[in-house]
Amino acid sequence: MSSTQFNKGPSYGLSAEVKNRLLSKYDPQKEAELRSWIEGLTGLSIGPDFQKGLKDGIILCTLMNKLQPGSVPKINRSMQNWHQLENLSNFIKAMVSYGMNPVDLFEANDLFESGNMTQVQVSLLALAGKAKTKGLQSDVDIGVKYSEKQQRNFDDATMKAGQCVIGLQMGTNKCASQSGMTAYGTRRHLYDPKNHILPPMDHSTISLQMGTNKCASQVGMTAPGTRRHIYDTKLGTDKCDNSSMSLQMGYTQGANQSGQVFGLGRQIYDPKYCPQGPAADGAPAAAGDCPGPGES
């Protein structure tokens, strides 16, 4: 049976876009490194075409027997398609038993039909890294060595002692100290010599937490509770007695009582109601003779 029946026609549309995207991720440099690594371990030549040299599965099964002897008991050297697919299936099963992660594996058709050579390359690189992790020495430095599990067992006493240790997530106390600090609860006098504030001599000293008294003074202030006369010399307010009006009540500079009489009767005279005419004796009429409003 010819292998042409497994070949597919050209891809179009979305299938072609997906195929081109997968091919763009294929690394020719990694292919050359894999070629050197496989040929160095197996002693077999892959040939100019990497996919055609590995599609029969013979070289790959030989590689697994070098990494893990007896992992592939039987290698089919027939050119029949199902024999080649069987070799690829046995190689994939051997990788699983070798400890490969299932997400790093490829399918047989990915290599046989060249459907996804990028995944084939990823699987072989992961296999090289797994072999390096297990201590395989090779002339070609390829693959990433996986970190090994580091497990520690602690007794109960050690676990309880670790509960008193401050974790690094909480910060560090390397640069912290209590130098210069007084004991907790001790009385402290707060002052600052840089601001020329003298050390406190008594309990009436204002601490720095309340501000500073450097520029404050009581010059010109009388003792609390002392009677004070409020006046202003600029406004002409006299300070002779207690009848002086404070500035809060206004000022009397422009006010006076000239022409006012307190306690005496006042004659109300309105020229509109008192006609100016000669009396019988030739004298003006008296103010009391003026008729009131509404009188004739």
Swiss-Prot record:
Modified residues (N6-acetyllysine): 8, 25
Chain positions of Calponin-like repeats: 166-191, 206-231, 245-269
GO MF term set: actin filament binding; calmodulin binding
Calponin-homology (CH) domain boundaries: 28-132
Entry-linked SUPFAM superfamilies: Calponin-homology domain, CH-domain (SSF47576)
Modified residues (N-acetylserine): 2
InterPro entries: Calponin-like (IPR050606), Calponin/LIMCH1 (IPR001997), Calponin_repeat (IPR000557), CH_dom (IPR001715), CH_dom_sf (IPR036872), SM22_calponin (IPR003096)
Phosphoserine: residues bearing it: 138
Region (Disordered): 275-296
Keywords: Acetylation, Actin-binding, Calmodulin-binding, Phosphoprotein, Repeat
Pfam short name (any one): Calponin
Family as reported in the entry's similarity comment: Belongs to the calponin family.
Function per UniProt: Thin filament-associated protein that is implicated in the regulation and modulation of smooth muscle contraction. It is capable of binding to actin, calmodulin and tropomyosin. The interaction of calponin with actin inhibits the actomyosin Mg-ATPase activity.
Protein name from the UniProt record: Calponin-2
Natural source organism: Sus scrofa
Lineage: Eukaryota, Metazoa, Chordata, Craniata, Vertebrata
Underlying gene: CNN2
